[in-house]
Design a protein with these regions (language model features):
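Ubiquitin-like/PB1-type beta-grasp interaction modules and other compact soluble beta-rich domains
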Residues: 1-160
Length: 160
């Protein structure tokens, strides 16, 4: 029997096809709390906390943009319950009722990927997260609280 297929070439084509597939993102589907819009910013707020987020990618701090979650397609002329006002990393988490708000809500509102597989389009490396200096494996499921200091570290693997 003659093998008319070069198995090595077939494997290379399969690898190329896998490499060309778009990355899936945790932000592809909005967390239900991410769809909630604040139309009135007043004293009736039952929840108003400020955790701080720092993102370090391969040793370089990544700037979190100002006005993330403000005046978006989902919330025109309004704010999402998780948003920023400046690029300091201070997250504003506000709502008319108290809720357990996971970190993924902010990333979904921002339109960025984050979980144990990576952050943004960085995948295949190591993701670590600390909360107030203590390692956490909760990643996107971490519940936000006032004055938390959340630091996400991404380190590329060799050859990435």
């Amino acid at each position: 029997m003659i093998n008319v297929f070069d198995d090595d070439k077939e494997e290379q084509v399969e690898e190329q096809n896998l490499a060309e597939e778009p990355l899936t993102s945790t932000a592809d589907e909005m967390h239900p709390l991410g769809n909630y819009c604040l139309t009135d910013h007043n004293s009736s707020m039952q929840m108003h906390i400020h955790p701080y987020l720092t993102i370090i990618i391969d040793g370089q701090e990544y700037e979190i943009p100002s006005n993330a979650g403000i005046d978006t397609d989902t919330c025109p002329s309004a704010m999402h319950m998780t948003h920023t006002h400046d690029d300091s990393g201070k997250l504003h988490v506000e709502n008319y009722t108290k809720e357990d708000v996971p970190l993924e809500v902010f990333f979904d509102v921002w339109g960025m990927h984050f979980n144990e597989t990576g952050i943004f389009d960085y995948r295949g490396g190591t993701v670590e997260m600390t909360v107030n200096g203590t390692a956490s494996q909760d990643f996107e499921k971490h519940i936000l609280a006032d004055q938390q200091n959340i630091v996400i570290f991404y380190t590329s693997s060799q050859g990435e």
